[in-house]
C-alpha cells in the first residue's frame, strides 16, 4: 500500500512571500500498520539577499510589518518600578550570600547608582554585623576617584540599603580574562591608579586586606575603582605593637607575613597583594598557584615567583621587589612611586575634597552647579555663635589662628574682601609652585609633582580655602587639608595667615555687631 506525503519544494519568491509550493511524493508504509500522519517539513531559510530580491517580497514584508505595528499598543503598560526613597530600582547587578546589588536611578536627576540591599536577619544570623559596620565606616572616610564612593546608607526593619557609585565596566578580573593579559602600557596605567587608591586609603588609616582583581572594578573610561572593604582594617584594629593580627584575604593574593600569624603591617601586606595583581595583569597567570592549599602557602612563604623574561627589565625589577617575602626589604609605596618603570606617563590622581560630597542625606540627592569664584564668590555668612562653634574652645584668641585636633583645618580672621583674599591666596601659592582650581566658592590649592612628597609617601598636598563672612568688613578664612604633607601644609598656612590675617584680638572686638552678639552669648550663662 502506498501513501502520499507532502514534501515542500521551494523557490526564492515563494519562500520570501511565505507561500510554499507542494508536490505529491509516494512513500511506503508497512503492512497492517496504522496510517501515518503526513510530516510537513519547513522550507529552508532563504538567504538574506533573497528577502528583498523581488518587488513582491518587499511589498509583502512591509505590509506585515505595518500590520504588526498597528496591533502593537502605542504606549505599553509597564509595571511600576519599586522605589527606595527617591531611587527607582532596576535590574539586579549581582547576588551574594547576604543580599543583592541592584541598579537604581535617582528619580529627580536620572543619575545611576548601585544599591546594595542586605538582609538584616541573615547578617545577624551569620554574625557579620561588625563586618558590615566596618565597611560602611570605611567607605564614609574614602573620597577618591579610584575608590567606589558610598553616597548614602538607610535601613528598614528588614533591610539595609547602601547607595554606592555605579561602575559599569565590570571587574578587572573579567577584563584580564577577556584579553588573556594586558599590555605593559595598559597594565602600568591601571597599576598607577591602584597605587594611588591604596596610598590614599593608607593615609586615612584604612588597610583593605582583600585586594584582588575581583574587588577592583573598571568604569566605562577604563579607570579602576577599588571596592569591597568588608575585610578592611581601621587604626583601632591594631594592637599595642602597631600591627594587625587577623588572618584574612584570598589565598592566592595573601602576603607571607599574614600566613605566619605573628602580626603584620597592613600597608605592606596590601602592597604584596597589589604586586600579585600587577603580575596577573601583565602575564595572565598567578605567580603562586596550586590546588593544594598547603602547597600554595609554601610557595607564597618561599616567594619564588617565576617572572617571565619577555617582560621589560623595568617590569621584571618592580615585580621582583614588590613580591619580596620579607616585608622589611619589600618595596613600599614611596619606593614604588620612585621606580623608573612606575613613573612613566604617571599623573597622580587628586582625591576629592572632604566637602565635595553629593550632599545626600535622608534619601535626597542635591545637585549643585559650579560657580566661578572670580565672578561670583559664594561666601557664607556667620555670626558670633557660629564662629564660636567653629572653634574647639571659647577662647577668642583661637579665632585668629586656630588648628583643630586632626591638623586638617587652620582658620584665621582677615579684613580683606573675599575677592581680594582669593586673589592674594592664589598669587601666593602660585609663586610657591602650586596649582589652583576654583570651584563652588572655594579655592583648591594643589601640589603636583611626580616625586614622592615625603619619606612616608603621603602623596601630593591638597588644600581647600573657603571664606566665611562675619560682617561686611570681617571674614574668617578656613584652610582645610585633604591630603599631603602636614609640615608643608602648616608652613603654607602660617605664611598666608601672617600676610592676610588680623594679628590683634582687639581689632575683632572693635566690631559693634560682634561685641553685641558676644555680650548676649555671655549673658545667657
From Swiss-Prot:
Induction: By drought and salt stresses. It comes from Oryza sativa subsp. japonica (Rice). Its EC number is 2.7.11.1. Residues 372-401 form the NAF domain. It catalyses: L-seryl-[protein] + ATP = O-phospho-L-seryl-[protein] + ADP + H(+); L-threonyl-[protein] + ATP = O-phospho-L-threonyl-[protein] + ADP + H(+). GO terms for molecular function: ATP binding; protein serine kinase activity; protein serine/threonine kinase activity. Residues 228-257 are annotated as: Activation loop. It is an enzyme of class 2 (transferase). Its cofactor is Mn(2+). The active site is at 210 (proton acceptor). This is CBL-interacting protein kinase 21. It comes from the Eukaryota. ATP binds at residues 93-101, 116. Belongs to the protein kinase superfamily. CAMK Ser/Thr protein kinase family. SNF1 subfamily. The gene is CIPK21. CIPK serine-threonine protein kinases interact with CBL proteins. Binding of a CBL protein to the regulatory NAF domain of CIPK protein lead to the activation of the kinase in a calcium-dependent manner. CDD domains: CIPK_C (cd12195). Keywords: ATP-binding, Kinase, Manganese, Nucleotide-binding, Serine/threonine-protein kinase, Transferase. Residues 87-342 form the Protein kinase domain. GO terms for biological process: signal transduction. Residues 407-436 are annotated as: PPI. InterPro entries: Kinase-like_dom_sf, NAF/FISL_domain, NAF_dom, Prot_kinase_dom, Protein_kinase_ATP_BS, Ser/Thr_kinase_AS. The activation loop within the kinase domain is the target of phosphorylation/activation by upstream protein kinases. The PPI motif mediates the interaction with the ABI (abscisic acid-insensitive) phosphatases.
Amino acid at each position: 500500500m502506498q501513501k502520499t506525503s507532502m514534501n515542500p519544494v521551494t523557490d526564492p519568491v515563494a519562500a520570501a512571500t511565505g507561500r510554499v509550493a507542494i508536490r505529491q511524493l509516494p512513500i511506503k508504509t508497512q503492512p497492517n500498520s496504522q496510517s501515518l500522519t503526513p510530516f510537513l517539513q519547513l522550507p529552508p531559510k532563504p538567504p538574506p539577499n533573497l528577502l528583498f530580491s523581488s518587488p513582491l517580497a518587499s511589498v509583502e514584508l512591509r505590509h506585515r510589518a505595518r500590520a504588526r505595528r498597528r496591533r502593537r499598543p502605542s504606549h505599553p503598560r509597564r509595571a511600576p518600578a519599586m522605589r527606595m526613597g527617591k531611587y527607582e530600582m532596576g535590574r539586579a547587578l549581582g547576588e551574594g550570600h547576604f543580599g543583592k546589588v541592584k541598579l537604581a536611578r535617582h528619580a529627580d536627576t536620572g543619575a545611576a547608582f548601585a544599591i546594595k540591599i542586605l538582609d538584616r536577619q541573615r547578617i545577624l544570623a551569620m554574625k557579620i554585623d561588625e563586618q558590615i559596620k566596618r565597611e560602611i565606616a570605611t567607605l564614609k572616610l574614602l573620597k577618591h576617584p579610584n575608590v567606589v564612593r558610598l553616597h548614602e546608607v538607610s535601613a528598614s526593619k528588614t533591610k539595609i540599603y547602601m547607595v554606592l557609585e555605579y561602575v559599569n565596566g565590570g571587574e578587572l578580573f573579567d577584563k584580564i580574562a577577556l584579553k588573556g593579559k594586558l599590555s605593559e602600557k595598559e597594565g602600568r596605567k591601571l597599576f598607577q591608579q591602584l597605587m594611588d587608591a591604596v596610598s590614599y586609603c593608607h593615609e586615612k588609616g584604612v588597610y583593605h586586606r582583600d585586594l584582588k582583581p575581583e574587588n577592583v572594578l573598571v568604569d566605562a573610561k577604563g579607570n579602576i575603582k577599588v571596592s569591597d572593604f568588608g575585610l578592611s582594617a581601621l587604626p583601632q584594629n591594631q594592637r599595642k605593637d602597631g600591627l594587625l593580627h587577623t588572618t584574612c584575604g584570598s589565598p592566592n593574593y595573601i602576603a607571607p607575613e599574614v600566613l605566619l600569624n605573628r602580626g603584620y603591617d597592613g600597608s605592606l601586606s596590601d602592597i604584596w597583594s597589589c604586586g600579585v595583581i600587577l603580575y596577573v595583569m601583565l602575564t595572565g597567570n598567578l605567580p603562586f598557584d596550586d590546588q593544594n592549599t598547603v602547597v600554595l602557602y609554601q610557595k607564597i612563604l618561599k616567594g619564588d615567583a617565576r617572572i617571565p623574561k619577555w617582560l621589560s627589565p623595568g617590569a621584571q625589577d618592580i615585580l621582583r621587589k614588590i613580591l619580596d617575602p620579607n616585608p622589611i626589604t619589600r618595596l613600599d609605596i614611596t619606593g614604588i612611586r620612585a621606580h623608573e618603570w612606575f613613573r612613566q606617563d604617571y599623573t597622580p590622581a587628586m582625591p576629592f575634597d572632604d566637602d565635595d560630597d553629593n550632599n545626600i542625606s535622608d534619601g535626597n540627592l542635591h545637585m549643585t552647579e559650579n560657580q566661578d569664584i572670580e565672578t561670583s564668590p559664594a561666601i557664607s555668612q556667620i555670626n558670633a555663635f557660629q564662629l564660636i562653634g567653629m572653634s574647639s574652645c571659647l577662647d577668642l584668641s583661637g579665632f585668629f589662628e586656630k588648628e583643630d585636633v586632626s591638623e586638617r583645618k587652620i582658620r584665621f580672621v582677615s579684613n580683606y574682601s573675599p575677592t581680594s583674599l582669593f586673589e592674594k591666596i592664589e598669587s601666593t601659592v602660585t609663586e610657591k609652585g602650586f596649582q589652583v582650581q576654583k570651584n563652588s566658592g572655594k579655592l583648591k590649592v594643589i601640589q603636583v609633582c611626580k616625586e614622592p612628597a615625603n619619606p612616608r609617601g603621603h602623596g601630593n598636598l591638597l588644600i581647600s580655602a573657603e571664606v566665611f563672612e562675619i560682617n561686611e568688613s570681617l571674614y574668617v578664612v578656613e584652610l582645610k587639608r585633604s591630603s599631603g604633607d602636614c609640615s608643608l601644609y602648616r608652613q603654607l598656612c602660617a605664611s598666608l595667615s601672617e600676610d592676610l590675617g588680623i594679628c590683634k584680638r582687639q581689632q575683632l572686638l572693635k566690631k559693634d555687631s560682634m561685641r553685641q552678639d558676644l555680650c548676649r552669648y555671655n549673658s545667657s550663662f
